[in-house]
Design a protein with these regions (language model features):
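Glycine-/small-residue-rich active-site loops that bind phosphorylated ligands and cofactors
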Residues: 2-3, 32, 142-145
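Long helical/loop segments within the catalytic core of UDP-sugar-dependent glycosyltransferases
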Residues: 3-22, 34-117, 128-129, 150-190, ...
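Catalytic donor-sugar/metal-binding loop of nucleotide-sugar-dependent glycosyltransferases
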Residues: 115, 124-142, 200
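Active-site donor/metal-binding and catalytic loop motifs
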Residues: 138-152
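Membrane-embedded multi-pass helical conduit in multi-pass membrane proteins
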Residues: 195-203
Length: 203
C-alpha cells in the first residue's frame, strides 16, 4: 500500500477518479445524516462558494469527563470561531471532514499538498487567496466519535498543533504580501494559523 502523503496523499490520488463536480469528505468515524446533501448542496448555487463546512456532532459525548470536555471545546470552536469567521468574512478553514469541496476549487488552489500535517488548513488558505469563499453551516451536524483515551487525544492535538505551525511557516509570508487582502484580515489569518501554540499548555 502506497502511504505517501498519508491522508493528503490519498485525497490527492483520488482526485483523478472523481467524475463529479463536488466532493464530500468524511473520516471513518463520521455518520452523516441521510439529508446531509439536501441541506448543504444548495449553497453551491453561488459559484464563488468553494467549500461548505458543517458542525461536528459527538456520538460518544457522555462516555467520560474527557469526552465531555472535548465536546465542550469543539462546540465552542464551531459556534464561536467558525461562526464568527464566516459572519465577518475573515479567513476560515475546512475542518478536514464533515464538509463538501467544489472540485474546481481544489484544482484552482493547487490541489492537496503533502508538506504539512494539516492539509485541510493549508488548502483552505490557498483556496481563499485564490478568491474562493467558504460557507460554515452551524445548523447542519455531522456526528462523529471523540477520542476516549488521553493518549489518543494527545496524538490528535499534537498533529493539529504541529500542522498549524507548519501552515504558519508555509503561508505567513504569502498572506502578508498578498495584494487584495485587508490588513485586518491578514492579522486575523496569521493569528488563526499561529494559535495552535496554545495546545502546548493544554498538553
Amino acid at each position: 500500500v502506497d502511504r505517501t502523503g498519508y491522508k493528503a496523499g490519498a485525497l490527492d490520488s483520488a482526485m483523478d477518479a472523481v467524475e463529479g463536480e463536488f466532493i464530500a469528505i468524511f473520516d471513518a468515524d463520521f455518520e452523516p445524516e441521510a439529508d446531509f446533501l439536501q441541506r448543504t448542496m444548495p449553497y453551491f448555487e453561488d459559484e464563488k462558494i468553494g467549500v461548505v463546512q458543517t458542525r461536528w456532532g459527538h456520538t460518544n459525548k457522555q462516555y467520560s469527563i474527557l469526552t465531555e470536555l472535548q465536546a465542550f471545546g469543539l462546540n465552542g470552536h464551531f459556534a464561536v470561531e467558525q461562526g464568527g469567521r464566516t459572519a465577518s468574512g475573515h479567513f476560515i478553514n475546512f475542518n478536514g471532514t464533515g464538509g463538501i469541496w467544489r472540485k474546481k476549487c481544489i484544482e484552482d488552489a493547487g490541489g492537496w499538498e503533502h508538506d504539512t500535517l494539516t492539509e485541510d488548513l493549508d488548502l483552505s488558505y490557498r483556496a481563499q487567496l485564490k478568491g474562493w469563499k467558504f460557507k460554515y453551516c452551524e445548523h447542519v451536524v455531522a456526528p462523529a466519535e471523540l477520542p476516549i483515551t488521553m493518549s489518543a487525544l494527545k496524538s490528535q492535538q499534537h498533529r493539529w498543533m504541529k500542522g498549524g505551525a507548519e501552515c504558519f511557516r508555509k503561508m505567513a509570508w504569502r498572506i502578508l504580501t498578498f495584494k487584495g487582502v485587508k490588513a485586518s484580515d491578514k492579522i486575523h489569518g496569521l493569528s488563526h494559523l499561529f494559535n495552535s501554540s496554545v495546545f502546548v499548555f493544554i498538553l
